[in-house]
Each structure stands twice: as C-alpha cells, then as structure tokens.
Curated annotation (Swiss-Prot):
Shows greater sequence similarity to the alpha than beta subunits compared to other heterodimer snaclecs. PROSITE patterns: C_TYPE_LECTIN_1, C_TYPE_LECTIN_2. Residues 1-23 form the signal peptide. Pfam families: Lectin_C (PF00059). It comes from the Eukaryota. It comes from Macrovipera lebetinus. Keywords: Disulfide bond, Hemostasis impairing toxin, Secreted, Signal, Toxin. This is Snaclec A1. Residues 34-155 form the C-type lectin domain. The keyword Signal applies. It is found in: Secreted. GO terms for molecular function: toxin activity. GO terms for cellular component: extracellular region. Heterodimer; disulfide-linked.
Length: 156
C-alpha cells in the first residue's frame, strides 16, 4: 500500500513539474510543440500563396512558419530535416515571409502579422518569396519565385 502511494505521488510530482514548461502544449495530432506554438511540415508541393492559404485552413491562427529567433530557426530546421520526404522539390521549403514589391528586400511583417525580429538571409535577389534551402540544412533563407511549388511548414 505504501509503495503504491509513493509511486502515485512520484507521478504527480513529474506531471506538476512539466506543467507550464511547454510540455503540456496541446497540438493537433502529427504536429510538434515548441515554446507555445505547434508546427508541421507538409510534404505537399504548393505555391507560396497556396501554402499560406492551406496553413490558414488548418486552424484559426495557422500560417506559414514565422521564425523569430535563432532557437526557433534551429528547431524548424531540425523539424524539416526529420520530416521532409525526398523528391526533386525538397531543395526548398516555404516560410511565411515575402516582399511587398521587388524594390523591397522583405515586407515589414510575417504572414501571421508578427514583426521581423530575426533575419537569416543567404542572398538578396529580386524574387518576392522566401524559403529555407536544403543546401544550408534548412537554416538560411533564400529568395524564391512565389509561383514555384515547394514543400512548406505551418505554425499555429
């Protein structure tokens, strides 16, 4: 009897210690939790606009991923590397950032409306949409043609 209470108490302590750490983040099945947000790599080829629309249809607050820190960039890069299915279109993965016009390097906010607090461009070109590049292990942002279909990562 005393042993059973000890085990139950131990499990309660573990549960309570995980509460509030992000470990209790409720994500949809197949989604991964990181610092209060949920992420999923989709192995579907879509244009930037279609990928963004698809992400908004996943949940009320869904968008293409916005990357706000090096820590989040590393998490997303690892998630993409582990979940992307190899095809000829896996060299790039859409993120939620694009230029408002060709004269601008980028818009002033991510597709979810948040400000750009972290930047990690590999090069500057005149294309409007940004993605992660396989050659950099999905850690650097590259300018891409918005109309090309690539895989993508959603965040809710």
């Amino acid at each position: 009897m005393g042993r059973s209470i000890s085990v139950s108490f131990g499990l309660l302590v573990v549960f309570l210690s995980l509460s509030g750490t992000g470990a209790d983040q409720d994500c949809l099945p197949g989604w991964s939790s990181h610092e209060g947000h949920c992420y999923k790599v989709f192995n579907l080829d879509k244009t930037w606009e279609d990928a963004e629309k698809f992400c908004t249809e996943q949940a009320n607050s869904g968008h293409l991923v916005s990357i706000d820190s090096k820590k989040e960039a590393n998490f997303v890069a690892e998630l993409v590397s582990q979940n992307i299915k190899e095809t000829r279109r896996t060299d790039f993965v859409w993120i939620g950032l694009r230029a408002e016009d060709k004269r601008q390097h980028c818009s002033s906010e991510w597709s979810d409306g948040s400000s750009i607090n972290y930047q990690n461009w590999i090069e500057a070109e005149s294309k409007k949409c940004l993605g992660l590049e396989k050659q950099t292990r999905y850690r650097k942002w590259v300018n891409l043609n918005c109309g090309q279909p690539y895989r993508f990562t959603c965040e809710i």
